[in-house]
Amino acid sequence: MTAALVAAPAAATMASGSSGLAAARLLSRSFLLQQNGIRHCSYTASRKHLYVDKNTKVICQGFTGKQGTFHSQQALEYGTNLVGGTTPGKGGKTHLGLPVFNTVKEAKEQTGATASVIYVPPPFAAAAINEAIDAEVPLVVCITEGIPQQDMVRVKHRLLRQGKTRLIGPNCPGVINPGECKIGIMPGHIHKKGRIGIVSRSGTLTYEAVHQTTQVGLGQSLCVGIGGDPFNGTDFTDCLEIFLNDPATEGIILIGEIGGNAEENAAEFLKQHNSGPKSKPVVSFIAGLTAPPGRRMGHAGAIIAGGKGGAKEKITALQSAGVVVSMSPAQLGTTIYKEFEKRKML
């Protein structure tokens, strides 16, 4: 039983009567899809939207709120092509010199937006994601932490049955192509255009890997924070496919943690798609090696339950796929550098 299953009873009790039964059924279906690593073909096709660059047109949902304002200003200063935002009831006004719209559909039609970032409080975040799906925004990045898992089960159920919109998050730092496009809350100044693709369940450990790869002179090609919740829109395998097919990405850092089976699925994916003489070096760190079973460690998805989801099992799976696993997050940069040295890639 993984974090998803642990979340199921709690989420199901949040509703009563027929709505509770419906939510329980959705939970069961989404859990099985996630457990078996299944992605509907249509949703898998949306992986291509994960790659952002200077041409990505971004809107912000929750644009005029405190968080939306602060991080939109940061994005503009970084050079992100932010083209507007939405706040219901404030359409027609301007904010930070950009137009405000009442709906995502209107914002997309008027600006040609290809991505949306969500800074909306937890009770309303799922509705914001659904609004972006309705508007067929290609990439949606939800930063919000604390969204009820029952809400996210419904969102995930819907996501897997369409192929127009790709979701990153929730409860994540976002995505960044250094020097080109920053969507989220990550500190832009530590990033440097380079050769390493980084994908992580942990926001702060992402920044650690970024800083280290910058320090050793390798830099980053694309960094994706997939978030630490049990029901998210993008997992390791989605990002790994992008990294393996991206000529600018020459090495990969994967940062996982206890709970769920995303790391094990990533290991299987790497066995199938990253072997042979042209394979790319992959370095990993798994947080929670000393975590006690049954206790949630920070993220909603970071819990060892039913004897599964432990760090040791994840490390073994990754090593069997040829991944070099660092025992310390402080050594990610030097470890990937040494792998480049071994392969004469410097």
From Swiss-Prot:
InterPro entries: Cit_synth/succinyl-CoA_lig_AS (IPR017440), Citrt_syn/SCS-alpha_CS (IPR033847), CoA-bd (IPR003781), CoA_lig_alpha (IPR005810), NAD(P)-bd_dom_sf (IPR036291), SUCC_ACL_C (IPR005811), Succinyl-CoA_synth-like (IPR016102)
Reactions listed under catalytic activity: succinate + ATP + CoA = succinyl-CoA + ADP + phosphate; GTP + succinate + CoA = succinyl-CoA + GDP + phosphate
Residues bearing PTM N6-succinyllysine: 57, 66, 338
Origin species: Sus scrofa (Pig)
Residues modified as N6-acetyllysine: 54, 57, 66, 105
Subcellular location: Mitochondrion
One GO cellular component term: mitochondrion
HAMAP family cross-referenced by the UniProt entry: Succ_CoA_alpha
Entry protein name: Succinate--CoA ligase [ADP/GDP-forming] subunit alpha, mitochondrial
Tissues expressing this chain: Isoform I is expressed in all tissues examined: liver, brain, heart, and skeletal muscle. Isoform II is expressed only in heart and skeletal muscle.
Matching SMART domains: CoA_binding
Main subcellular location of this protein, as a coarse class: mitochondrion
Protein family per UniProt: Belongs to the succinate/malate CoA ligase alpha subunit family.
